[in-house]
Amino acid sequence: MANFATVPDKVQIFPVDKYRDSLQFLFSLSLWVGKNLPIGIEMDTQALLPATKTFKKRASIKQSNELTEAAYYLPLQAKRVLWLCLMQAYFNDSQEDDSDVLPLFKISVSDYVKYFNVATSVASRDVKAGVNALGESTVTFYPKEGEFEEVKRPWLAEAGMKRGRGSWQIEFNYKVMPFLVGLTSQFTTYSLYDCGQLNSVRVIRLYESLCQFRSTGVWITTHDWLCERFMLPASQKNNIAEMKRTFLEPALKKINEKTPLKVTYTTEEDGRLLFNFLDKKQ
């Protein structure tokens, strides 16, 4: 029986999820295999792809349009904790139905490090701060059906830390969960990789709103809607020119520089804001 070749000391095998371009990695690996494995011995490089796909799949965000359109403000740490919960809710391979989603989520420091590329000490502080901010904050939903036009509720029912284990268990308010998993079948989806370089929650929320209409590339809204849903400060609420100068235009510049979208906007005669955008890959 043929002996399998050993990997030379000078060859380094990196984790697949560190490669932005898996095809480049597989091509390099194929060259190494061709030079080092004995004739007749083959290596299935395709077997390495699921790990990459799984990692990227779990870095995808899928949130209900009710959440995209909700009024809330969270600090960046809390927004990231919310992302980790949404990833668990929608990309659990064992989950068959959205109705199976429980309000309990485990938030680990190690996951925060992996997805947001920060040191463990920073992640530990961020997770604690994020969970605390969620626990102290409320969110306002605007259901299209039902008795109420606005529903304001606290995010969480409970949060508990496991000391020494680097993890938190949080329980969402059971009345909030239907809005998270979707009262309808309409969702906003995007990749965490696409907006990971945005460090302003209000800019992130603008990006999420654009992604809601990604299929058409057109979104029409108003100054009042942006101020209400993104909880913009009074100076921007009271002066549309100030809002454009200090929020909207800098936000679109960041989105154009750091995400896959290319966005422009115009102001209609009636004051509405018309956004046109497309994916840069198109």
Task: Indicate residue ranges for each PLM-predicted region.
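Charged, alpha-helix-forming regions
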Residues: 8, 12-282
